[in-house]
A protein has these predicted regions:
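Two-component system phosphotransfer/interaction surface
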Residues: 186-225
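Intrinsically disordered, low-complexity regions
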Residues: 29, 135, 197-198, 205, ...
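A short, structured N-terminal alpha-helical element that caps or precedes a catalytic domain
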Residues: 1-192, 242-245
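Radical SAM [4Fe-4S] cluster-binding motif and immediate context
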Residues: 219, 223-255
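Conserved radical SAM core fold
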Residues: 120-134, 196-198, 203-207, 253-255
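Active-site-proximal loop/turn and secondary-structure-junction residues that shape catalytic pockets
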Residues: 171, 204, 250
């Protein structure tokens, strides 16, 4: 069976109803792993590197339902993009919001783009930074975002897909401060902007944005040219002896 051209998804922390407990949505900010825990300590003997027990987190952050792998519920931003693509001429069979637990089912040779919705992908939000002592520990937000990207890359390799992976939504600014993750996750582009990323900035331009992605028009787009659609910046980061690059896309619809 052919796979869709465009696959949209989000990690577990953004796809959970949290058992209907409103404040539980902050639970993703909780520390998951302490990589520096003393292996001779009492807590290491009980929990290993876990801080907040995973069994507790997974109970509260329960899975949202799916229908044959398609997410029944999804973040509003993803629904906006989905609706925009259908409005702009993409066929229903070519666009899917995949449940993160079934992402492998939808990535294949026909897949052109995988888009992820990210609010706190690297655990740099203010609440998360407080709970993790400034990222000395790994939050569940970061833990499950990393898991999602590793699964996407594994699915691409297994299924022979050359899909471009893009990240969007309000947390994409965090990649500026940990650019090594751009390389680790294999991100082709990062969609950022003042209003929160993947949906508001391309509202009314969803089809054009994905046409550009699929056609390769973001490869060498002139960042200094004022235009009525998108602006691309190729950023370079030095981290010790390593150099990283990131392709950042902004919606460019200003007077």
């Amino acid at each position: 069976m052919a796979t869709p051209k465009i696959v949209l998804t989000a990690d577990r922390t953004l796809m959970s109803p949290y058992r209907g407990i409103s404040l539980a949505t902050f639970f993703g900010c909780a520390p998951a792993i302490d990589p520096n825990r003393d292996k001779n300590s009492f807590w290491y003997k009980i929990l290993k590197n876990q801080v907040t027990p995973k069994v507790l987190f997974d109970f509260i952050c329960n899975w949202s339902p799916d229908i044959n792998g398609v997410a029944k519920y999804a973040p509003y931003g993803l629904r906006k993009v989905e609706a925009g693509l259908l409005r702009d001429g993409y066929a229903r069979k070519d666009v899917v919001i995949a449940h993160p637990n079934h992402i492998e089912k939808f990535i294949g040779p026909e897949t052109e783009v995988v888009g992820t919705y990210e609010m706190d992908p690297l655990g740099m939000g203010p609440v998360t930074m407080t709970f993790t002592f400034g990222r000395k520990q790994t939050s569940y937000d970061e833990f499950y975002n990393a898991e999602l990207h590793h699964r996407i890359n594994a699915a691409k390799k297994k299924n022979g897909s050359h899909a471009k992976v893009i990240a969007g939504a309000s947390g994409t600014w965090q990649y500026n401060y940990a650019p090594e993750k751009i390389e680790e996750y294999g991100l082709y582009a990062i969609l950022e902007g003042e209003l929160g990323g993947i949906a508001p900035e391309i509202d009314g331009h969803a089809g054009r944005f994905f046409d550009y992605l699929i056609d390769g028009q973001f490869e060498n787009m002139d960042p200094f040219r004022k235009r009525k659609d998108f602006k691309v910046d190729i950023k370079e980061y030095k981290r010790g002896d390593n150099t990283y690059h990131g392709r950042f896309v902004n919606f460019w619809d200003r007077p």
